[in-house]
Amino acid sequence: MIDSLSFTTMPVVLLVGLVLYQLLAFTYRLFFSPLAKFPGQKIAGMTHWYEFYHDVIRRGQYTFHIRDMHKKYGPILRINPYELHISDPSFYNEIYAVQNRRRDRWEWSTRPGGFGGSVGGTNPHELHRRRRAALNPFFSRANIRKLQHEIDQKAVQLVERLEKETDRVIKVNHAFAALTNDIVMQYSFGRDDNRAAHKDRAARALPMEMLSKISSVVAMFWQEKQSITEEVRQILNGTNKAYKERPNRTIYHGILESKLPPEEKELNRLAEEAQITIGAGTLATAWVMSVGMYHLLAPGSVSMLKTLREELQRAIPDPSEPIDLAALEKLPYLTGVVKECLRLGNGTTTRLQRIAPDETLIYTDPNTGKVWDIPPGTPVSLSSLHIHHDETIFADPESFRPERWIENPDLERYLLTFSKGSRQCLGIHLAYAEMYIVLARVFRLYGRKEEGPSKGPSDKLGNLELFETELRDTLCVADLVVPAVWEGSQGIRIKVTE
């Protein structure tokens, strides 16, 4: 009888216990938590289910909802039981500090990705610094300079492919992803899949629009993970000898020669590191260049492209010669184009939380003068997507205006595509090099019909025009870690004409 009663009442007891636990948790979070004093919607501070609803049920909408909450509650906001979000860019350097100020990642946000072995997914400050130190030399400005010939070769392959595809439709997000994937695979493993030169291989370079479907993302990255793990395994067991044929060391052969302890050179950790390197090095740069391609070919931007082409014609009188990256970086209009690509393309849209484990961060609301003490150990974030579209910083923020960077060089501090601080994106110099060289190669030789006679050498190979592509094909409508466009998008498509 007692056993039977216990068996039948146990579910009820567990349910009551769960309800009481949740009530106590809600009460603590609302009234006694160190974050209870901060502004925000009460339900957001009570439970993660509020964020879950906006990000999972509504598909990547919490970033946009946070922006709306800031309009109501002010520049500092509690967005879940443990995290604060700040919309004030002047506080950016406090959140993403440099030098010897410790900043950890928040394990709650990095654990679900399954990339804790990578530099980007490493939470503790000291472990992150150790892992990053092994990779820093490969991504330094000086070492990326040594890669410029390889990048230029890939850009030339892309131009040659455009010549072959005259009067055909090309998905430039595929074409750019093929190019960036070739480059990062070469630098990582010494292997060149030659995707940039072949239409049928380009679509396998992690196509961007697949990100509009979660199931496709899972399948895509699982397949890529198996391939990358095998690449790392071959490096570990010594069967990959491709690096011996390269003038520059590959990243993962170099890691094996580094001073990292043996446990940091195990297969699973290096495979996670490699997957992040390949994925980010392929998708992000390809997407921001694709966004730039749209804007340079969009209706009403004829004078913009003409200005760019005239600058490139002066800087590159003979396009058959190798391109000099240092010379390109000095071109003001090309630099403005690159930065507008980064601002409107974003690269990543997810919040990148930072924890100051041993500091109380002090934030002063510029509107009210109220001072907020942020307790040590609190995850704090700021969204680059919000800053890049802030009309108080970027006038007419939805417009692609390269001139803004020439008119106001101080805008540089608000360009947050690669984050900042001690955890800034490792690949920043590689991404910049790819963008400068590829955009210069393409638009030195291709223009558009409407631009009229050129002031420079008449060696144009042809014209580019958009094909059934609209502005909405470039706009971020959901935060899926990277920007996701509307579900019906066919990508950013162009047509090559004579």
Curated annotation (Swiss-Prot):
**Which Gene Ontology terms of cellular component type are present?**
membrane
Q: Which UniProt keywords apply?
A: Glycoprotein, Heme, Iron, Membrane, Metal-binding, Monooxygenase, Oxidoreductase, Transmembrane, Transmembrane helix
**Chief location:** membrane
The topology of this chain with respect to the membrane is: Single-pass membrane protein
- Give the molecular function GO annotations: heme binding; iron ion binding; monooxygenase activity; oxidoreductase activity, acting on paired donors, with incorporation or reduction of molecular oxygen
Q: Can you tell me which residues bind heme?
A: 425
Location relative to the cell: Membrane
Q: Which reaction does it catalyse?
A: preasperterpenoid A + 4 reduced [NADPH--hemoprotein reductase] + 4 O2 = asperterpenoid A + 4 oxidized [NADPH--hemoprotein reductase] + 5 H2O + 5 H(+); asperterpenoid A + 2 reduced [NADPH--hemoprotein reductase] + 2 O2 = asperterpenoid B + 2 oxidized [NADPH--hemoprotein reductase] + 3 H2O + 3 H(+)
Q: Which residues are glycosylated?
A: 237, 248, 346
Family matches, as Pfam families = p450 (PF00067)
CDD domains the record matches: CYP58-like
The highest taxon in the source lineage is: Eukaryota
Q: Which cofactor does it need?
A: heme
Name the job this protein performs.
Cytochrome P450 monooxygenase; part of the gene cluster that mediates the biosynthesis of the asperterpenoids, sesterterpenes that exhibit anti-tuberculosis activity. The first step of the pathway is performed by the sesterterpene synthase astC that possesses both prenyl transferase and terpene cyclase activity, converting isopentenyl diphosphate and dimethylallyl diphosphate into geranylfarnesyl diphosphate (GFPP) and further converting GFPP into preasperterpenoid A, respectively.
Name recorded for this polypeptide: Cytochrome P450 monooxygenase astB
What is the originating organism of this protein? Talaromyces wortmannii
Its gene name is astB
